[in-house]
A protein has these predicted regions:
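Intrinsically disordered, low-complexity Pro/Gly/Ser/Thr-rich segments with frequent PxxP/GP/PP motifs
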Residues: 94-118
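Beta-strand signatures of extracellular beta-sandwich domains
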Residues: 79-83
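Bacterial N-terminal signal peptides that target proteins for export
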Residues: 1-10
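Terminal connector regions
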Residues: 116-137
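Asparagine-centered strand-capping/turn motif at beta-strand->loop junctions
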Residues: 67-71
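A short beta-turn/strand-edge loop motif at beta-sheet boundaries
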Residues: 72-77
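C-terminal motif of bacterial Sec signal peptides marking the signal peptidase cleavage site
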Residues: 18-20
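Transition segment at domain starts
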Residues: 22-60
């Protein structure tokens, strides 16, 4: 039996966020440090690029941005760490969030997380992901 493709209708997207499965869960917790990543940073730098900025949301400051996929295969189930940096550039706190959806090859995917301090600098690190099979299956 052939599976029907998942369509991202407005109702599905709303239910996704209400269920807490999106890029931000209401209980996003900041901890002292991020877990160790699954891939070498040199490989990640070849495959992906990140961009992030602190913006003001309805419920306070947030870190939002994109993961850009430069590789010839899509990535899915991507977990990222967002590190709050001290003035000297050292990580002082971290939260982990799932990137919303997949990161298609040659494209980008969005992420967002609440930020504890709008004036702080933040760094985004990819902690883990799975390569998608060719053909998107």
């Amino acid at each position: 039996m052939r599976r029907r493709p998942l369509l991202l209708t407005p109702h599905f997207v709303a239910a996704y966020f209400i269920a807490g499965c999106g890029g931000v869960s209401p209980s996003t917790a900041w901890q002292a440090q991020c877990p160790q990543g699954s891939y070498a940073p040199q490989s990640l730098d070849e495959w992906f690029r990140t961009s992030a900025e602190v913006t003001q949301g309805r419920h306070g400051p947030k870190v939002e941005g994109y993961i850009y996929n430069n590789y010839f295969a899509g990535a899915e189930q991507m977990l990222i760490g967002i590190e709050q940096l001290s003035p000297s550039g050292h990580a002082v706190a971290c939260t982990t969030v799932w990137v919303i959806g997949s990161v298609p090859q040659g494209n980008r995917a969005y992420f967002v997380a609440p930020a504890p301090d709008a004036s702080a600098k933040y760094r985004v690190r990819i902690l883990s992901f799975n390569w998608m099979k060719r053909g998107g299956q």
